[in-house]
Amino acid sequence: MVQDLSTLTAFIDGEPMRFNDGDTVLKFIDRHRGRGHVPTLCDAPQLEPYGACRVCSVEVAMQEDGPRRVVASCHTPLTAGMHVFTESPKIRKLRRNIVELVLTDHPLDCLTCEVSGNCELQTVAAKVGIRQVRYPSGANHLNRSKDRSHPYMTSELSKCINCSRCVRACDEVQGQHVLSMHGRGFNARIIKGLDQSFMDSTCVSCGACSQACPTSAISDVFFSKSIEATRKTRTVCTYCGVGCNLNVATKGSEVLSIQAPTDSEVNHSHTCLKGRYAFKFVKHPDRLRKPLIRYNGHFTEATWEEAYDYIAKNLQRIKEEHGGNAVGGISSARCTNEENYLMQKFIRVGFGTNNIDACARVCHSPTAWGMQKAFGTGAATNSIEDLEYTNCILITGANPTEGHPVTGSKIKQRVMKGVPLIVIDPREIELVPYAKHHLQLRPGTNVALLDMFAYYILEAGLIDQDFIKKRCENWEEFEQGLRNLNLDESERTHGVPREKVRAAAIEYASAKGAMAFHGLGVTEHSHGSKTVMTIADIAMMTGNIGRPGVGVLPLRGQNNVQGAADMGCQPHQGAGYLQVNDEANHKLYEEFYGAHMSNEIGWKIPQMYDAALAGKLKALWIMGEDVVQTDPNTEHVKSALNALEFLVVQELFMTPTAEFADVVLPAASFLEKSGTFTNGERRVQRVNAVIPPIPGTKSDGQIVCDIMQRMGIPQADYTPDGVLAEIARIVPFFKGATWENLTDQGTQWPIKEGGIGTEILHVDSFKRGLGKFHFFRFQESKEIEKHHDEFPFILTTGRILEHYNCGTMTRRTGNAQIVTEDLLAIHPDDAAKKGIESGDMVRIFSNRGEVNMKAKISTEVKPGILYTTFHFPENLVNMVTSSECDEDTMCPEYKVVAVDVEKVPASSMPKKQRMMEIA
Amino acid sequence: MAIQYISGKEPHAREKRLIFKNIDRVGFTPSIDSFLEDGGYEQLKVALKMEKSAIINEVKASGLRGRGGAGFPTGVKWGFIPPTNTKPVYIICNADESEPGTFKDRYILHQDPHQLLEGMIIACFAVNAKLGYIYIREEFPQAAIIVEKAIAEARAKGFLGKDILGSGFDCELYVHRGAGAYICGEETGLIESLEGKRPYPRIKPPYFPAALGLYMSPTIVNNVESLCHVKHIIQMGGAEYAKLGTPNNTGTRILCVSGDVQKPGYYEVEVGKVTMGEVIDVLCGGMKPGRKLKAIIPGGSSSKVLRADEKFKLKDGREIGIMDIPMDFDTMAACGSMAGSGGVIIMDDSRSMTWVINNLNNFYAHESCGQCTPCREGSLWMKKISDRIVSGEASPDDVDSLESVANQIEGKTICAFGEACSWPTQSFIKKFRDEMKGDCKPELVGEIVSDEGKVAAAGLAA
């Protein structure tokens, strides 16, 4: 027996056990005796200790026979040599008495309760052995009414046991502070917002409260805590680059509900309303269930065989008539690594062309490019987990609480605990009230602002000389550039007082460790890549690379946008980021694939459109992307698609893009297939099929594999683990990845032999050897130069929490009941000048086109700036966006659009709209 | 010139007026002029020239124990601020005087606010707190107005603000008003409230706000009366002050006597220098005519009740009766109760103990914050059961079940409210069980589980 009391040993009912520094008594018991050995009502693994239910009480003593004290084990720190008595008669009586009191005010309709069999109160009551309730009935809360106002969240507070778990989940997990306790003592009760319904409150429906509630007092319409399901499958969310793990409950082929696994390193019991609740699109009647072939302008249902034959015939013909370069492919960041890998292989091997691209083009291509130039690797240098260790957070051009909700919550939690936050954004995003610094610049002036930011770091002498000298190159040029800055001109350009920039720069540079997050507000500009490189400069000049709590972290938009690029869905780099026009690489690829391949860089997506219009691109294959709705300058995209001879689209739904196709292939959604997604922190995670593909559909990987085989391109039958094994052989940083060793938590690449992952990149040296500084002088966007005089407003676009991109999926879920349309945010001063009021229909027009939508007067934007989202096809905002793009990567400049705005007279509104107004 | 008091409100000869010197004094107003005429803020001037540690040492030497209820040594509390602390330090004056039977702080706030301010500024200086809050309960609206005016006056005279009296010490005091909750008198609940949150008392650790309190910074929470004593300790010196009262029970304290005596009211006496018998018979003029003493709650409603005919065995072997108990901290504790907040409630033989405990249980059920299950549910059940006993509808077994509810609250909650609400019930039942059972219906013995309860327990009720 271990008796060394000088170390971390304590006793559970007389038995000596090791404990960890910082353990509470309950954590210690849980670890050695299993969760539930000591019952509790108010404690939950995802929440801070609370100590209110007292059911977890134990007796403690410093000697085995010494005087004992009753303490709540959940918040009592363990000390060496402590004796813990978990089930003395006194404790058992105490627990029984408490639960008995709770039951005096709890309905006993257990058999018909949705959580029957999974109710923590029920379990605890059973465990402590309640046989009777001795107290005569009296005042109680059994008649509280149910809240059924919300498409997802429900409450039935007669079942509430006042444990405050929901309030704490709202505060500590989500950080929304919607739920609170009202009244005191026996009259204490949970309220939402200002004692409103879920629907009327500011609830963001993340469901953290529902998952935390030990009873059915707060739940959801899917009864996610019921034990009705026959199977629970762990998989990864398809909605954004955070990569939340999901536990999906199913019965047969029906998806019942989704919860977030408590042990997930990525999302620790948390996820947002998209991951948790927006899954009903899966069996939506609109799902495509049969291949469609366009004959004479009309779609006709076909069998898979017919469709494959038709495709193979046409592609073969075009290849023969116009050469392989007349074919192109657009892969999808929504699909798995395996599917993306096969897609690029299909195009490259099948047609001997590098005309393969993916939707990263329109979001984070400047990140991949810029970070490769600076560091050698186009991916996040650190992990989200590093937020726990950082001393300062810088967010440039990102709105994480809407776009990356779980990461947004984590940032908010850290900031609420005192970590200073700097937000560089033209809008007052949700995090701004929490931020110490908000640099509200004019859209399109990132480089001007960040140059000034870097200048003030230099001026304050806060650079890391040692790091610069040992780890970087080209510093002198960068320093010279900064020293030559014209601060007056910069200040005029970006519009933020220089003192504010200076204060923020000093905050960032003087922190022991600072993390820089960025999003599409950085990349989707004509100087997107340059901005990324300037952020990299700032991180390097302050030594914020290569250790915990620092780094440059792009908030990747789509669930697998990292993976799509990793897998080679880029025209200039093949699988594993090997340059296709490099001789050695070209040879490597040709040998690996045993085929003749092109060593010329292919077309990027915008170039494909131009090539189509020029008659050079004849056939295009689009896997899971709605380019008509999401790519800029819609009319231009449409005419390009019209100019194609042959278009194949793999889709879940008949999207505006699929409408242009010659063949539409019905694909399976993420819940219906297996594979891997790589999240924004390079974490390769297993996606597990939750249900089989709905009848008539196939996974995207299966489809590509089928067509490859049909066209005689050598490819083994499709299995996700088989393709992963092939990937591991060609992609250097996947070398050690196997289906098995990715484990439930996933592994961050580079993955070494044995499946060992990498949390932090560039620890001792950069991937490219030395980190390279780049200095760029601000240049005005051509969009502003050309059109600002005629169209004096700057429109910038973004996303909201409730909808995902063009909303193909979320508009077919309950989310559509929460947010029903896109709105245009306009500053009150501008609105007054234009005679616009909130709710008015307005016309936004640029030299490309126009779009009508409702206005929302808001100070989230400065005068002269307009903001809207792009989720609804009814408000096709890309009608007005421009074809201007990042010089290096051709990522479109969605964030700076010269427009004008005017109120639409009621008579010129569409008829349906008028009817609604009148009603 | 001798101090003149309002006719009929003159201090009793047995009193020793330090803190209440100016209460009911003819011509004395809450204004700073009155206070200055009386030598006000002179001790602040003295203190500002002292070493900070010397002030703390004087307070330690004085033996001053907190007058809010717990009787914790004030100087020791001040010493808990971590020496390595780099965060701001706060002082909070707990003016949430809400313990039933206690009514001393309100007189200080209403009539002599500058005495509090002077003591508090000295305390701030001693612990290097540049910011202090006076948390005044909602039910004292006038007090808040008076104290705010006093703060403005003190500021105008340079006793607050930047560089007080050229000492280089900056200090600001603010009044914060409660919203009507007893729990805000609990120091961590008060801190939460001051932070703008629901006043749920905090879990331990941290064990003392002096380590982590307001805004997670070291915070000293002292009662109004305790802070007033600081001024007098500076004036007299700690050692001299300690000569007042009895060893370990030094200084003076204000007793708030209510109930069935001829002259209820406030009496400032040297701690331990008067007995309970003297309080009743000498200070308060005895019991009401023809009435006999039945019971005493000696230190605010949360302290355990004492029976008139009880005998108490002291550590030194003496056995004393209730009238012989000296009014101090230690003897009162040895007698199984506590000196608490100084609220002495005298009950004569006309009082029904069942009614009294029911009255208290109603109060505590109303004031439980609702955070901890045993207290939230238990305090209500204590009320429900004692309601039933009072109405004569109870079984004698109900008295035992009432006791068992109290037993499972005590020591099983985050804050001391658990004890505060269960001690009265436990002690009343222990000492007046027969009387309470006598108020019940004997024929109901064995029937305490009502029919509905039985059904509910079987899991059959809707």
For each of these PLM feature ranges, what is it?
Chain A
Residues 12-15, 251:
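Short strand-turn-strand beta-turns centered on an Asx-Gly dipeptide
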Residues 17-80:
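N-terminal cofactor/phosphate-binding cores enriched in small/glycine residues
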Residues 555, 562-570, 720-814:
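Long, low-complexity segments enriched in small/aliphatic residues
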Residues 107, 163, 168, 224-673, ...:
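Catalytic alpha/large subunits of respiratory electron-transfer oxidoreductases
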Residues 693-751, 813-824, 829-919:
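Long, contiguous, secondary-structure-rich segments that constitute the structural scaffold
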Residues 11, 80-86, 195, 433-441, ...:
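Short beta-alpha connecting loops at secondary-structure transitions
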Residues 54-206, 210-236, 251-254:
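Fe-S ferredoxin-like electron-transfer domains
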Residues 108-146, 297-298, 462-498, 575, ...:
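N-terminal leader/propeptide and maturation segments of large enzyme subunits in energy/redox metabolism
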